[in-house]
């Protein structure tokens, strides 16, 4: 019997254990940041343990960093977290992409950009959106702080192998419709728990035609569908992306092995979902989880349960309204879902020559220093600033209400991030998940519009 891509990578990393029971996996790459690592490092100190593989552990600063003045950290908690990671990196010999360095940025962007993320690896991070790296044909998943400490001490983790779910996506994406719309549509259609207990493998011609940026967007939000893992077969697009990256000096000797990473024709999946994107519309969420979304042309649904009622009450919306009726106040272009160069380029096409609507506060936060520098070389910062956007330093920013960048209470925000939970972007903030193009158009028009009619 053939094996799935996920099976192949998993089986190569099993050190001990039987199928159906917890198995001990070797971890190839451990990415850490300032929020979920301090307690784990302290655990090592208390037990007088060494960091098992400092050469496979890499740190960056992202969740709680300021995006206006990176060297004047006013928040005491943020300053403590940042300085603690800086000290831990020195004490334990960990390579850190520090504040102001050329590579610093959101952890799920730094890994791919530096070449640390590679096909066939097992990758963990104390962050729920670690599945992003699965776009390279890696098994990548988020872990808790106690597991972070376990990897620190042993470079292994006990995990139970999930079932395999194939999501076969075909058809040509219409103009103005993007990878973000694909994953939002899947979650809207099948729910926030359809992937629970599964590893999601995204396949099909649509996936093959996506850039690595688009593939990362889809895998990034696998967790929003309940899945711990999202994975895509590596191909020439993948290899070309990895080639020449600073930490990919093993490329020549590894690429032939990477070409063996695919699901066999006779591999058996536990479940298969098929999607034709030929008529897919731009997606907009109306509620308080990513499942609560609609096609742009559709009205918000009738109330079916208490969760819907609570969501409508929190969001200040009603059934039958449409996305264009939402009174927007903020637009956020950023996050590990959509703050890559291609996202900013797409948004800039819509913004160029226009002005941000007077009712809108709009900010752009490149996901990494690398993206920021590349965008500025292309003049994107000038385009956004001339239109009235704020152009910020890299970090997680307004994706989560942890750092200074927050949406005011009761204000609706068009956001390119991945979660629209209550309070996610700040106390009482009302988040609507959309593609970068939809967010950019909303900033200019002061409301959601059909981006298919304005994209160039």
UniProtKB/Swiss-Prot annotation:
List where this protein forms a coiled coil.
Answer: none
Cofactor detail note: Binds 1 [4Fe-4S] cluster per subunit.
Q: Does the keyword Cell membrane apply?
A: no
Fetch the Gene3D superfamilies from UniProt.
Answer: Aconitase, domain 3
Which pathway does it take part in?
Amino-acid biosynthesis; L-leucine biosynthesis; L-leucine from 3-methyl-2-oxobutanoate: step 2/4
What the entry lists under PROSITE patterns is as follows: ACONITASE_1, ACONITASE_2
Q: Which InterPro entries match?
A: 3-IsopropMal_deHydase_lsu (IPR004430), Acnase/IPM_dHydase_lsu_aba_1/3 (IPR015931), Acoase/IPM_deHydtase_lsu_aba (IPR001030), Aconitase_4Fe-4S_BS (IPR018136), Aconitase_4Fe-4S_dom (IPR036008), IPM_dehydratase_rel_enz (IPR050067), IPMI_cat (IPR033941)
**Enzyme Commission number(s) from the entry:** 4.2.1.33
Which catalytic reaction applies to this protein? (2R,3S)-3-isopropylmalate = (2S)-2-isopropylmalate
Molecular function (GO) terms listed? 3-isopropylmalate dehydratase activity; 4 iron, 4 sulfur cluster binding; metal ion binding
Question: Per UniProt, where does [4Fe-4S] cluster bind?
Answer: 336, 396, 399
Q: What processes in GO biological process is this protein linked to? A: L-leucine biosynthetic process
Its keywords, alphabetically, are:
4Fe-4S, Amino-acid biosynthesis, Branched-chain amino acid biosynthesis, Iron, Iron-sulfur, Leucine biosynthesis, Lyase, Metal-binding
Please give the Pfam families that the UniProt record associates with this protein.
Aconitase (PF00330)
Necessary cofactors: [4Fe-4S] cluster
Which PANTHER family does the record cross-reference, listed alphabetically? 3-ISOPROPYLMALATE DEHYDRATASE, HOMOACONITASE, MITOCHONDRIAL-RELATED
The record's note on quaternary structure and interaction partners says: Heterodimer of LeuC and LeuD.
Q: Which family does it belong to?
A: Belongs to the aconitase/IPM isomerase family. LeuC type 1 subfamily.
What job does the chain carry out?
Catalyzes the isomerization between 2-isopropylmalate and 3-isopropylmalate, via the formation of 2-isopropylmaleate.
Q: Can you name this protein? A: 3-isopropylmalate dehydratase large subunit
- State the taxonomy lineage: Bacteria, Bacillati, Bacillota, Bacilli, Bacillales
């Amino acid at each position: 019997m053939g094996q799935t891509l996920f099976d192949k990578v998993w089986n190569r990393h099993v050190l001990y254990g039987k199928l159906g029971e917890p198995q001990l996996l070797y971890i190839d790459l451990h990415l850490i940041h300032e929020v979920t690592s301090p307690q784990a490092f302290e655990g090592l100190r208390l037990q007088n343990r060494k960091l098992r593989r400092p050469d496979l552990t890499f740190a960056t600063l992202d969740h709680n960093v300021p995006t206006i003045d990176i060297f004047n950290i006013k928040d005491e908690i943020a300053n403590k977290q940042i300085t603690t990671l800086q000290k831990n990196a020195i004490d334990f010999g960990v390579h850190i992409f520090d504040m102001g360095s050329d590579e610093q940025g959101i952890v799920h962007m730094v890994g791919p950009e530096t070449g640390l993320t590679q096909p066939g690896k097992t990758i963990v991070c104390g962050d729920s959106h670690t599945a992003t790296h699965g776009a390279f044909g890696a098994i990548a998943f988020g872990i808790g702080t106690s597991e972070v400490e376990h990897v620190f001490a042993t470079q292994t983790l006990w995990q139970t192998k999930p079932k395999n779910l194939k999501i076969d996506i075909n058809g040509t994406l219409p103009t103005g419709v993007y990878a973000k719309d694909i994953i939002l549509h899947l979650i809207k259609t099948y729910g926030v728990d359809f992937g629970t207990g599964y590893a999601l493998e995204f396949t099909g011609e649509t996936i093959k035609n996506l850039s690595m940026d688009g593939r990362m967007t889809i895998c990034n939000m696998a967790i929003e569908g309940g899945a711990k893992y999202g994975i895509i077969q590596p191909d020439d697009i993948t290899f070309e992306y990895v080639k020449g990256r600073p930490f990919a000096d093993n490329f020549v000797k590894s690429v032939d092995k990477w070409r063996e990473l695919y699901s066999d024709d006779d591999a058996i999946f536990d479940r298969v979902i098929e999607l034709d994107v030929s008529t897919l519309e731009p997606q907009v969420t109306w509620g308080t989880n990513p499942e609560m979304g609609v096609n742009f042309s559709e009205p918000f649904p009738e109330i079916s349960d208490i969760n819907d009622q609570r969501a409508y009450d929190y969001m200040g919306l009603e059934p039958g309204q449409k996305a264009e009726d939402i009174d927007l106040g903020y637009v956020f272009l950023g996050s590990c879902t959509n703050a890559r160069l291609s996202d900013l380029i797409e948004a800039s096409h819509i913004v160029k020559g226009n002005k941000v609507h007077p009712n809108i506060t709009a900010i752009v936060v490149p996901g990494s220093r690398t993206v920021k520098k590349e965008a500025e070389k292309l003049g994107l910062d000038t385009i956004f600033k001339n239109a009235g956007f704020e152009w910020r330093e890299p970090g997680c920013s307004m994706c989560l209400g942890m750092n200074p960048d927050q949406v005011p209470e009761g204000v609706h925000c068009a956001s390119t991030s991945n979660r629209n939970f209550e309070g996610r972007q700040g106390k009482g903030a009302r988040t609507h998940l959309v593609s970068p193009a939809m967010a950019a158009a909303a900033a200019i028009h002061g409301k959601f519009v059909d981006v298919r009619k304005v994209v160039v």
